[in-house]
Amino acid sequence: YAPSALVLTVGHGESAATAAPLRAVTLTCAPTASGTHPAADAACAELRAAHGDPSALAADDAVMCTREYAPVVVTVDGVWQGRRLSYERTFANECVKNAGSASVFTF
């Protein structure tokens, strides 16, 4: 099997370069889901469905979020099925982050 091991972070701010990480978790998806991520099984299943592309994660359109701007930045770094992966995205606030990434960034 090709390795799939990631480190995910979340912090307040508009970019990873200026935001201090508030939380970080590890996520290993091969051969089985493990790591410090609180929902490793669900997060791995969602990443598999998105072919390892965090930008393709399905958003939950049923969630209603306020329009407050309190930016939250997430990062993913590591290896997905043997390929290097580096991803960064800024969400308008924590609610939008949680709705926009299902289990992957909910930690």
Curated annotation (Swiss-Prot):
What GO MF annotations does this protein's record show?
A: serine-type endopeptidase inhibitor activity
Task: Please tell me the species this chain comes from.
Answer: Streptomyces coelicolor
Q: Which residues does the UniProt site feature Reactive bond point to?
A: 67-68
Subunit structure, per the record? Homodimer.
Q: Which UniProt keywords apply?
A: Disulfide bond, Protease inhibitor, Secreted, Serine protease inhibitor
Q: What is the name of this protein?
A: Subtilisin inhibitor-like protein 3
Query: Entry's SUPFAM superfamilies?
Result: Subtilisin inhibitor (SSF55399)
Gene3D superfamilies annotated for this entry? Answer: Subtilisin inhibitor-like
Q: What does this protein do?
A: Inhibitor of subtilisin BPN' and trypsin.
* Positions of disulphide bridges: 29-44, 65-95
